[in-house]
Swiss-Prot record:
Gene: chlB
Alphabetic keyword roster: 4Fe-4S, ATP-binding, Chlorophyll biosynthesis, Chloroplast, Iron, Iron-sulfur, Metal-binding, Nucleotide-binding, Oxidoreductase, Photosynthesis, Plastid
Record function comment: Component of the dark-operative protochlorophyllide reductase (DPOR) that uses Mg-ATP and reduced ferredoxin to reduce ring D of protochlorophyllide (Pchlide) to form chlorophyllide a (Chlide). This reaction is light-independent. The NB-protein (ChlN-ChlB) is the catalytic component of the complex.
Catalytic activity line of the entry: chlorophyllide a + oxidized 2[4Fe-4S]-[ferredoxin] + 2 ADP + 2 phosphate = protochlorophyllide a + reduced 2[4Fe-4S]-[ferredoxin] + 2 ATP + 2 H2O
GO biological process, one term: photosynthesis
Cell compartment(s), UniProt: Plastid, Chloroplast
Enzyme Commission numbers on file: 1.3.7.7
GO cellular component entries: chloroplast
Assembly: Protochlorophyllide reductase is composed of three subunits; ChlL, ChlN and ChlB. Forms a heterotetramer of two ChlB and two ChlN subunits.
Cofactor: [4Fe-4S] cluster
Keyword set includes Metal-binding: yes
Pathway recorded for this protein: Porphyrin-containing compound metabolism; chlorophyll biosynthesis (light-independent)
Cofactor note: Binds 1 [4Fe-4S] cluster per heterodimer. The cluster is bound at the heterodimer interface by residues from both subunits.
UniProt-recorded name of the protein: Light-independent protochlorophyllide reductase subunit B
Amino acid sequence: KRLPGESGVSVNQVIPEGASLKYLKDLPRAWFNAVPYREVGLMTATFSEKEYGMPYISITPMGISNTADFIEQIGKLVNVWASVLSERKLNYRLYVENQTKFV
């Protein structure tokens, strides 16, 4: 939740954290799925992609390189929607550079 939130992305649901049937109905409202650990959630993400056309990211954000890739993939997917809804794209590269500059 923290990593996408810091880059300006609202998190719809974190599954299985605190999940219940009440909240599962909101899953199709997401713009994409993030699967930071393939052991948990990959089957749900592939189902959502097949059933709802919802893309997913399956990169474990550990280490500088993978974390940067994870954020950049989020940026690409968010920009698809941002350009449709507001005709404005967001630059996530600057966020990645700021987060990794002094490491």
